[in-house]
């Protein structure tokens, strides 16, 4: 309610078309938010697409598969990644990750995908290194520690008796994971994913370094520079 009241003067002057207009021309009082909205949603989606399965694997390994001597140091190492300032991720992404990403991923994948209908459009264009796809990958690296830590904690809440009973009737490790651990912890897993999504949507500095900060939406290519609401 407070947000609607505060934004009402803007809505009255510019209308709701502000949300789907891509032109931004301050001298002529034309303001469109489509470009940053699109950039924010797409980079966050890419980040979740990468981070969720990786975090899931890390959490399962730490709780069900890793030997006892490895669980604690590896868990601490994952948590330490969450303490790295976002500007460090951004600078690393711009100066180290982006050049390698352009040469070893964007160029070969672009050549392979270029002749595939629809999908090829997502990987077309020059390999800049920076852009929407690169920003999504950096965001994924940033949110993996958060999602993995939450998933690990909720997996550890599964009652030991339930797992031991499943093992007692002959279930394998993977059967225990899929039939006991996951059904018991699904709400916590969803909560961890939502935490990661919130982190991705609100990230500023790392995205500012790597997304390209170009106010344009002339191509569907994920290689193209873009913009986000926070950057």
Task: Mark where each language-model region is.
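Hydrophobic alpha-helical elements at and bordering transmembrane segments
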Residues: 33, 37, 41, 74-80, ...
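Membrane-interfacial helix termini and adjacent extracytoplasmic/periplasmic loops
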Residues: 5, 10-34, 90-141, 211-212, ...
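Transmembrane helix-loop junction
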Residues: 63-64, 95, 99, 103, ...
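Transmembrane alpha-helices
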Residues: 69, 77-80, 84, 88, ...
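Glycine-rich helix-loop "coupling/hinge" segments at transmembrane-helix boundaries
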Residues: 200-231
């Amino acid at each position: 309610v407070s947000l609607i009241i505060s934004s009402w003067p803007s809505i009255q002057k510019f209308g709701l078309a502000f949300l789907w207009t891509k032109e931004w021309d301050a001298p002529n009082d034309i303001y469109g938010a489509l470009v940053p909205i699109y950039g924010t949603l797409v980079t966050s989606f890419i980040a979740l697409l990468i981070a969720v399965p990786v975090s899931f694997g890390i959490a399962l390994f730490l709780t069900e598969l890793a030997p006892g001597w490895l669980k604690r140091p590896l868990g601490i190492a994952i948590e330490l990644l969450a303490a790295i300032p976002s500007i460090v991720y951004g600078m690393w992404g711009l100066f180290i990750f982006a050049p390698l990403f352009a040469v070893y991923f964007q160029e070969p994948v672009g050549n392979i995908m270029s002749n595939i209908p629809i999908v090829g459009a997502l990987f077309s264009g020059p390999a800049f290194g920076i852009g929407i796809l690169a920003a999504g990958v950096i965001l994924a690296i940033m949110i993996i520690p958060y999602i993995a830590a939450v998933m690990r904690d909720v997996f550890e809440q599964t009652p030991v008796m339930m797992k031991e009973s499943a093992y007692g009737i002959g279930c394998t490790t993977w059967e225990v994971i899929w039939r006991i651990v996951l059904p018991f912890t699904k709400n916590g897993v969803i909560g961890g994913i939502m935490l990661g999504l919130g982190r991705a949507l609100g990230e500023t500095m790392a995205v500012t370094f790597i997304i390209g900060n170009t106010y344009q939406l002339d191509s569907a290519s994920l290689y193209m520079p873009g913009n986000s609401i926070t950057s």
